[in-house]
Swiss-Prot record:
Keywords, alphabetical: Cytoplasm, Exonuclease, Hydrolase, Nuclease
Reactions catalysed, as given in the entry: Exonucleolytic cleavage in either 5'- to 3'- or 3'- to 5'-direction to yield nucleoside 5'-phosphates
Assembly, per entry: Heterooligomer composed of large and small subunits.
Catalytic activity, EC: 3.1.11.6
Membrane-spanning segments: none
InterPro entries named among the record's database cross-references: Exonuc_VII_L, Exonuc_VII_lsu_C, OB-fold_nuc-bd_dom
Molecular function per GO: exodeoxyribonuclease VII activity; nucleic acid binding
Name by which UniProt lists this protein: Exodeoxyribonuclease 7 large subunit
GO biological process assignments: DNA catabolic process
One Pfam family hit: Exonuc_VII_L
Amino acid sequence: MIDNDIANQVPKEFSVSEISNKIKELIENNFGHIKVKGEISGLKISSSGHAYFNLKENTAILACTCWRPILVKIKFPLNDGMEVVIGGKLSSYSGNSRYQLSVDNLQPAGLGAMIQILNERKIRLEKEGLFNKKRIPIPFLPDKIGVITSITGAVIKDIIHRIRERCPTRIIIWQVSVQGENSSHEMAEAIEGFNNLEEIHKPSVIIVARGGGSIEDLWSFNDEILVRAAYNSKIPIISAVGHEADYTLIDLAVDKRAPTPTAAAEFAVPVRSILNNTIQSYEKILLNNTNRLIKYHEQSIVNYDKIHRYFAYYINNRQQLLDETGFNLLDVLIRCIALKETKLKSFAKERINYAKIINYKILELTHQTAYLLKSVNNTLKNFEYKLELNSTLLASLDYHNVLKRGFAIVTGDAGNFLSSKSTATNEQSLNIKFFDGEINVVLSSHDLNARSS
């Protein structure tokens, strides 16, 4: 009996693999997808793009692994000391007797950290110009309104009720999540989807809306992908996120911000009663203007009739005056023709006398021409004789003819003419030019003395 009790108290024996697998099953089966809040420490990012760090709280530490496909989806940089909330699954590795958290999603936990991330993102997107686009005017009376929001909750009901109350029009609802990991992607895809519709189905304006909440609840509306989708939209967008005091980054990129979803509906459509009153007012103005215009044109027609009668009377008078002038002109023309015929007959009688005068003038011109030709010939002969005398005289004065008779021209170094022995100097170079050429000589004192003697 005692031996059996002792046997029952002996602990069960496990191999290392068995106990490791038991611990692995215990952890993974009892802890599914969990969320853990803590502070990042020991952050390391490998060359392959995976992140390894510890999540700590006081003295407790939990190892975490964030694989690259998850890491690239995180919209802010990770830093040591950052407080975060991590979603993931616990797993155990028997090779080193440790467990770790495999990260599925990661969000900033502290309000200060979220505000810092928000400010850094705002500055970066503002530098890119995403908040300075040219705003598209909201149409006065849209035929279709696109609403991007969750179909559960009071927001969509408030928008539909307000639009129907003010001015009923067609509403196209694009259902999305307005909170959570994929909500920003869903809303961005909804904006792009509305823009890609055919023109006949495309809304005139888009409302992006959700109710109020904490900064964590509204965080999706600060996502860069949603801000870029709003910036690139060709359809005007009205944002209505949270309450009047709540501001998100999408509010800076849209064409108009509404403080509440109800206000967004009011911005989108006018009040039907006011619109009817405005239409009636315009109808009265149009009717009054039309009546005034009709009366004006009636008076214009009366004035045109008076002008027409005046011009008819004026034209008849001018026509009568023209006829009388034509008759008078015909009489004058007949008298003028008769006068010209009389003068023509008189000219025929005088024509013979004019012929005699012309023949006399021709004879006189012939005599004068003969005399003029004779005078010109005599003058030319006289000029030829004088020209011949001057040519002979000019030839006798040519110095080349003088040189042919034995004379020469003597010049000094400077090209000056020497006409006397007294102008020559000792050792002077002389140029002596004959009729058929020239020579250069140099005088010596002997030559000068010989000539002197």
